Amino acid sequence: MGLFLYLLFMIVVGAFIGGMTNSLAIKMLFRPYRPIYIAGKRLPFTPGLIPKRREELAEQLGRMVVEHLLTAEGLRRKLNDPSFVQDMTSYVQEEVEKWLQSDRTVEQWLKQFGMPDPKQTAETWIETKYKTFMSQYRQRPLHEIIPIDVLHKIDHAIPSIVDRLLLRLRTYIESEQGERQIEHMINEFLQSRGMFGNMLQMFLGNVSLAEKIRPEIVKFLQSEGAKQLLVQLFINEWEKVKEMRIHEVEQIIDQEKIVVWVKRLTASIVQEPLQKPLGALVAPYVRHSLPTLVRFLLQFASERIERWMKQLHLQDIVREEVASFSVERLEEMILTISRREFKMITYLGALLGGIIGLIQGCITFFVQM
């Protein structure tokens, strides 16, 4: 009975010492948080290991994250992974679809992004561009401003324009309205000539002068000479127009009228799209091009991920974040992860201490015999 109690006592003492030693060693990883001084001398093992090595720990964690955990190659593999590309495409499509279903108009979206009056902004922009254009080209002739191909098209279009004009004139003159108009003009002309006009009307009697003149006018309009005359007239006038300087055109039309006309044109063009839901305007194009756009962006990111990571200085970010943690927070984080393992270490120390106590008790007992 005495031997059993003696050995039990040695086991308990050994287990207590072993458990307390390991528990104290674990606590000394974190505590004390700050160095302790007595008579101006720092006590050994103060502060604890982690508070003492916090800067070094932060540096090593930052290096470990960049070199072994969050590497450019690992991110590149993830970005190029077909399943990840498909997941990202599906996610973006879902989010964009929500946006496309929105009833918010283009004007509302523009206002949200800092454009309080899109219509006025467009008008102001057009007016500014007009004034800038005029300040640069006011002294230059039209033929230097209008594109060459447009000038050539107008040059070649003059004969066809003349043909259409002559056709319209012949059609009008051959109509009843044209006949009445010619007769009215002849009567006004004869009346303006006084006695000579009256004598001419008496000489003609009941014969209508308009009926005699109208066929000759039609005949003239059908002649090649009339066409060549008008073509040459149009060409001469067009050459004069091409030589006109921009400021001359501006004076003829009036600058203010041009600006007002441009603003009205802008308003008529811009107003309708501004009142439509943005989703309805862009939905067909977005849905069609979205998968290609997602793949392009992921490929773009994959090719530049290493450069971006260097520019982000991830190692410094991790180091600064860890260094900014209080020792209490570091202790809490590590214990949250490893509390069970630390307990097992304490229990292991108690177990080893108990075994050592048992062995020591047995040796002592046999030595004393």
From Swiss-Prot:
Main location as per UniProt: membrane
InterPro entries recorded: DUF445, UCP032178
Keywords: Cell membrane, Membrane, Transmembrane, Transmembrane helix
Key word Cell membrane present: yes
Transmembrane segments: 1-21, 347-367
Annotated Gene Ontology cellular component terms: plasma membrane
Membrane topology: Multi-pass membrane protein
Disulfide bonds: none
Subcellular localization: Cell membrane
Keyword Metal-binding: no
Signal sequence segment: none
Family the entry assigns: Belongs to the UPF0754 family.
Protein name: UPF0754 membrane protein Aflv_2299
